[in-house]
Amino acid sequence: MTTPELTAPETATLRAADGVDIDACHDPASIDPASVDVQGGSLALVVAHGFTGSWRRASLRRIASVLATTGGVVSFDFRGHGRSGGASTVGDREVLDLEAAVRWAWDLGYERVCTLGFSMGAAVAVRHAGLHHEVDAVAAVSGPSRWYYRGTTPMRRAHWVIERPLGRLVGRLALRTRISADGWDPVPEPPHEVAARISPVPLLIVHGDADRYFPLEHAEKLYAAAAEPKELWIEPGFGHAETAVPDDLLRRIAAWLATAR
């Protein structure tokens, strides 16, 4: 299936509830919305990237172009990433950033707003839905079920970047991510605990059996904790998050978000 190319997006600077500026963009649907099966009216998909990501990167623009064949797409940079202000808190105050993006989607006039998060963004999407119930459906891709996981080499490296002064310097210079030196106080509830409060909002958990960051136990724990309506998709050969997600899987996720109830 050929994916239509995106035109220049509408960009905006959003303001999170704690005053941090959030760089965001809006891509309208690239096809006639009437040709898509959508539950409840015009659809916006709000995309939450993973740690060190940015909506301006090629991987996220590809995702937006695929999703735009189903509905409008709102993308944004979490605090400490790209052109957004502030410093990354790696999944804590990022809930406020997603809240600002969701609010913008509603302000744009969409009648159905759903969130799609990858890795850290998946954890944020789960927490946002459980805390605020402001969306119609949630998809969490390659997300962790708990904090401080160090069971894989990539996650041990990630914790070095987050927790060590030299690591944060590398994060700023090489990964273009500004990371807060302050620890969590208090520690936010882990995603698997918040997942239990998402219902009645539909939750889709997607995980690859080739994920090198978080093994399948994370997806299984999230699914076990959540109440209905919920679905778990284990994808053969899929690696981790937005850089690995294939177009056909994105289309399936978008179709699920468009109709889940």
Regions found by a protein language model. Give the residues of each.
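N-terminal cap/lid segment of alpha/beta-hydrolase-fold proteins
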Residues: 1-37
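The serine-hydrolase catalytic nucleophile loop
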Residues: 51-64
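Conserved alpha/beta-hydrolase
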Residues: 64-85
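Alpha/beta-hydrolase active-site loop
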Residues: 89-108
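Hydrolase active-site cap/lid region
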Residues: 133-184, 201
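Short beta-strand/loop motif that positions the catalytic acidic residue
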Residues: 198-199, 205-207, 211
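Conserved alpha/beta-hydrolase "acid-adjacent" motif
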Residues: 212-218
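Catalytic histidine-centered segment of alpha/beta-hydrolase-like enzymes
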Residues: 238-248
